[in-house]
Amino acid sequence: VGWQWDVPRTAEQTRIGLTPPMVPLAARTPKTQMQLRIQPNKLEQCFALTDHHVGNLGHHTPICPLDPDDDGAQLLVRRTKYESPEKIERGKWKFVRAVGDHPISEHSHIWLKGGFKPGLIYDILFTPKDCPVVGAGMLATRDCTSFLRYEVASPFNGRVDHVIGEGQSQCGRFLRTFLHLGLNSDQKGRPAFDGVLAHIAGGRRGEFNHRYGQPSVQPTPSFGHLFPFGDLPQFDPLTGRTAGLLDRHRKSRNLPKIFYTDTSAEYWRGDAGLCHTELASGDDAN
């Protein structure tokens, strides 16, 4: 199932993806912006307006601005992740593409006078032209699974005993978000998956059901790093909330059997330890 809306759709690189419904401009209330992060490895005059954390492996669909001349758009820069950003003057950058040192009118890119410098962290805040229903990918996954499992018209009709959902890394985080939203029950109340294997997903989720969501985004700050982390209810000392990843499914049933598998990388940066830790004390969760 193609569930991600912004996968490459070029002649050179085409992947199975989702063509989602779009939210009309009049329905996008209140008016909001999206954040797009750029962390250059070398001096560059311009970048495509898309996720760059996987470099040339990505080539995600560019996200063009609604108004290329919007004075409310911002370009921020900082030297380290947690320091306060500096705002770059609006007259020093444009939503255009550069050929050499010359900007041309193509609004799928951002151009900065003097270039984007390596080692710095840039954040672009702007209102996109299009607003895909990003979460439709989760419903497509559930409904396709349900169709193949239960419907008479399914090519596998009568031959399905169990269905296992397996995902690695981003797809594992997709499955964790799927469970957190309580989506394992189809429209007739039947379970889509009997089991879920989320591999190297750590304790995170992702931008899979948000306005202007970028499903491949990993770096902080991002929706994927938000509480809750563990399956069972935890107390979060920062927000004062008590919640668990599977709270919705514990109420609605159809909870699949779940396996999480992680490597040391997920403990260093994937927040995996938060899945089985008391957040206030650091002790093992009960």
Where in this protein do the model-derived segments appear?
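C-terminal His-loop and adjacent cap/lid subdomain of alpha/beta-hydrolase
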Residues: 1-286
